[in-house]
């Protein structure tokens, strides 16, 4: 109650999350205490076992006796045990003889201490004393005696029955018979109680029924009495399967034969008694069961049915056993209702044998009707089981078909996935090949780029060397040759510009037009320079003609008359041999020349310089014209596409090679001249 009060107060005063957190903490704390308790319990058990002490009961050390004064507030054993351990303890029994706890289902007669459990003894060993349970394979004999048959045994005069219990332990060693007499009303009450129980219980249905053998033994041969002995031993049990139709036919034939013998032949009383006894022997051999046997078989059948068919609500064997039990009780009740005081048959009191036969026939008919009803119920159950089996088989076949379809679909999807995987593998291989190819192309381009870089560096170094050489040449010249050096510088710059223009022509085609216009401008400038030089040359020739008209007038007239279409360059070239001869003469006899001739020599040298300049200008002009035509051709070829660019690249490479050759030649010439 304290815990409930605490829970109610906590739930009222706080919110739900706080309650959950508090109880979570309390559960963890409880688990910790349980762990400590189990740890100390384990330590106590190990301590006692290690030192050989007596084990302590786990339920004895309780402090509620000290803290709780009132007994109703103390904890009981039921509250301290869980359901699993209570069920485990409930399945055990205490043996007072040996002082042990053992399974109650497997106890011998000495350990169980209960007479009702002796009928459940079977094969195996006792769970308490390990004694074999097969030492007493069947229970005590139950002997049913009528008032007439039991005279030698001292039965009662009021027609009561005498029950004799024969113990197997005393059998064969001068045993004593313990007798107890019961009135007939006792058995009537038992029969009525059995009927009520049969009506209240529900039968369970299964497919086959085992037959149990019953044995009859004679107790006293002198009196000619026969007793019904029920033997439940597994070793003496005769398991024979006989159909009910044959039994009914045998019973009917025996009854009919016996009736005819009684009516026609009127045989002796002893023969009549023997026939009735045989008839009872045949009937009770297949139908008569004791109460303990039927209960045992019902329990066994229920367990077997639960194991084999847990979903079936009824069992054939249980119903069949109940029917047989009911028929056996009806036989006893019919015999008792006759009022002759006999349990088995009524003719032993001096009744009419025909009446007995009629009663037996009625009994047989009742049994046959009961058997027919039973067979009808069996057929219904069989048909129901057949229908359920057919439905189950149909369901199984449908499930198998669905399983096959699912397997086929799974295989199809698996094939599709495998094919897709193959396609993916092929695509990956192609991509790998492409990647390798691209890598190779990339490496090749990198190599070409390195080659081009090396060539560019080489060309730059050559251009620098050329510029250095030109600068050195310019510094070595005199002040008078400044103009020539400037022109040479311009020519070198123009050469460099040409190389750059050719490169730009390959890379940038839009610059070609501008370069052509620049060439035209340079051409015009060069033509102007040529005109100036020609004018100077003409003035110088006029002066010379005035001084020495005999030599140059003829040559000039021939040049002007015979070669009117020639340019000033051809005229200058024609004068070169004379100028060279004059230079040689001047070098050889420079010291011996008179002072009057120094002026003439200076004028001749100036003429030679002018002629050289004119020749160089004309050469540059021709080069510019050729370069202009080349650029025009390059522009026309560049318009053709990739082939034109390839051709331009090849031409540019050849031009560079030629330029390097020219530079090397000029450098060698300069070195030789300096030497």
Swiss-Prot record:
<feature type="region of interest" description="Disordered">
    <location>
        <begin position="225"/>
        <end position="274"/>
    </location>
</feature>
<feature type="transmembrane region" description="Helical">
    <location>
        <begin position="17"/>
        <end position="37"/>
    </location>
</feature>
<comment type="subunit">
    <text>Interacts with myosin XI-K.</text>
</comment>
<keyword id="KW-0812">Transmembrane</keyword>
<feature type="domain" description="GTD-binding">
    <location>
        <begin position="355"/>
        <end position="453"/>
    </location>
</feature>
<dbReference type="Pfam" id="PF04576">
    <property type="entry name" value="Zein-binding"/>
</dbReference>
<dbReference type="InterPro" id="IPR007656">
    <property type="entry name" value="GTD-bd"/>
</dbReference>
<dbReference type="GO" id="GO:0016020">
    <property type="term" value="C:membrane"/>
</dbReference>
<feature type="compositionally biased region" description="Acidic residues">
    <location>
        <begin position="474"/>
        <end position="496"/>
    </location>
</feature>
<feature type="compositionally biased region" description="Basic and acidic residues">
    <location>
        <begin position="596"/>
        <end position="605"/>
    </location>
</feature>
<keyword id="KW-0175">Coiled coil</keyword>
<feature type="region of interest" description="Disordered">
    <location>
        <begin position="582"/>
        <end position="605"/>
    </location>
</feature>
<feature type="coiled-coil region">
    <location>
        <begin position="605"/>
        <end position="633"/>
    </location>
</feature>
<feature type="compositionally biased region" description="Basic and acidic residues">
    <location>
        <begin position="238"/>
        <end position="251"/>
    </location>
</feature>
<keyword id="KW-0472">Membrane</keyword>
<feature type="region of interest" description="Disordered">
    <location>
        <begin position="542"/>
        <end position="565"/>
    </location>
</feature>
<comment type="function">
    <text>Membrane-anchored myosin receptors that define a distinct, plant-specific transport vesicle compartment.</text>
</comment>
<feature type="region of interest" description="Disordered">
    <location>
        <begin position="286"/>
        <end position="315"/>
    </location>
</feature>
<protein>
    <recommendedName>
        <fullName>Myosin-binding protein 3</fullName>
    </recommendedName>
</protein>
<dbReference type="InterPro" id="IPR039306">
    <property type="entry name" value="MYOB"/>
</dbReference>
<feature type="region of interest" description="Disordered">
    <location>
        <begin position="474"/>
        <end position="497"/>
    </location>
</feature>
<keyword id="KW-1133">Transmembrane helix</keyword>
<dbReference type="GO" id="GO:0080115">
    <property type="term" value="F:myosin XI tail binding"/>
</dbReference>
<dbReference type="GO" id="GO:0017022">
    <property type="term" value="F:myosin binding"/>
</dbReference>
């Amino acid at each position: 109650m304290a815990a409930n009060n605490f829970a109610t107060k906590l739930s009222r005063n706080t919110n739900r999350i706080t309650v959950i957190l508090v109880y979570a903490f309390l559960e963890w704390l409880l688990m910790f205490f349980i762990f400590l308790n189990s740890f100390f319990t384990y330590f106590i058990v190990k301590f006692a076992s290690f030192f050989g002490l007596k084990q302590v009961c786990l339920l004895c050390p309780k402090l509620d006796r000290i803290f709780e004064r009132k007994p109703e507030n103390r904890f009981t054993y039921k509250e301290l045990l869980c359901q699993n351990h209570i069920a485990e303890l409930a399945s055990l029994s205490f043996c007072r003889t040996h002082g042990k706890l053992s399974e109650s289902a497997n106890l011998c007669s000495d350990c169980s201490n209960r007479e009702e459990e002796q009928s459940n003894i079977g094969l195996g060993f006792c769970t308490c004393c390990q004694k074999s349970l097969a030492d007493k394979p069947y229970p005590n004999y139950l002997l049913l005696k009528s008032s007439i048959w039991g005279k030698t045994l001292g039965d009662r005069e009021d027609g009561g029955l005498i029950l004799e219990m024969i113990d197997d332990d005393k059998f064969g060693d001068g045993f004593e018979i313990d007798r107890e007499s019961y009135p007939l009303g006792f058995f009537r009450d038992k029969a009525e109680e059995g009927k009520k129980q049969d009506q209240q219980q529900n039968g369970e249905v299964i497919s086959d029924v085992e037959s149990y053998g019953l044995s009859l033994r004679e107790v006293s041969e002198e009196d000619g009495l026969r007793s019904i002995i029920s033997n439940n031993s597994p070793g003496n049990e005769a398991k024979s399967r006989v159909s009910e139709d044959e039994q009914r036919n045998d019973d009917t034939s025996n009854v009919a034969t016996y009736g005819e013998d009684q009516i026609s032949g009127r045989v002796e009383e002893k023969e009549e008694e023997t026939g009735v006894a045989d008839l009872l022997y045949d009937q009770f051999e297949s139908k008569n069961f004791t109460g303990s046997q039927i209960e045992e078989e019902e329990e066994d059948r229920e367990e077997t049915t639960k194991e084999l068919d847990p979903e079936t609500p009824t069992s054939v064997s249980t119903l069949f056993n109940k029917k047989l039990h009911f028929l056996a009780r009806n036989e006893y009740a019919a015999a008792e209702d006759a009022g002759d005081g006999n349990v088995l048959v009524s003719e032993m009191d001096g009744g009419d044998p025909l009446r007995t036969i009629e009663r037996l026939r009625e009994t047989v008919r009742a049994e046959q009707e009961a058997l027919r009803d039973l067979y009808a119920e069996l057929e219904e159950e069989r048909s129901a089981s057949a229908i359920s089996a057919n439905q189950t088989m149909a369901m199984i076949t449908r499930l198998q078909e669905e399983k096959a379809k699912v397997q086929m679909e799974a295989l199809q999807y698996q094939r599709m996935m495998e094919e897709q995987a193959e396609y993916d593998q092929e695509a990956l291989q192609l991509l790998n090949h492409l990647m390798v190819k691209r890598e190779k192309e990339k490496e090749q381009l990198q190599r070409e780029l390195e080659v081009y870089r090396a060539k560019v560096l080489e060309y730059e170094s050559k251009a620098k060397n050329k510029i250095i050489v030109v600068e050195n040449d310019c510094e070595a010249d005199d002040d008078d040759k400044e103009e020539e050096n400037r022109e040479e510088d311009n020519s070198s710059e123009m050469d460099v510009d040409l190389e750059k223009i050719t490169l730009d022509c390959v890379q940038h085609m839009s610059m070609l037009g501008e370069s052509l216009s620049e060439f035209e401008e340079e051409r015009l400038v060069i033509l102007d320079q040529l005109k100036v030089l020609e004018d100077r040359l003409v003035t110088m020739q006029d002066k010379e003609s005035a001084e020495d008209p005999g030599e140059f007038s003829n040559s000039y007239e021939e040049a002007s008359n015979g070669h009117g279409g020639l340019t000033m360059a051809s005229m200058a070239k024609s004068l070169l041999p004379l100028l060279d001869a004059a230079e040689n003469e001047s070098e050889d006899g420079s010291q011996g020349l008179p002072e009057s001739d120094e002026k003439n020599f200076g004028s001749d040298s100036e003429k030679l310089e002018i002629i050289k300049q004119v020749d160089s200008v004309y050469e540059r002009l021709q080069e510019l014209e050729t370069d202009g035509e080349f650029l025009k051709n390059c522009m026309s070829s560049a318009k053709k596409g990739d082939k034109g660019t390839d051709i331009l690249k090849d031409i540019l490479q050849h031009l560079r090679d030629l330029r390097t050759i020219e530079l090397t030649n000029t450098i060698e010439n300069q070195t030789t001249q300096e030497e």
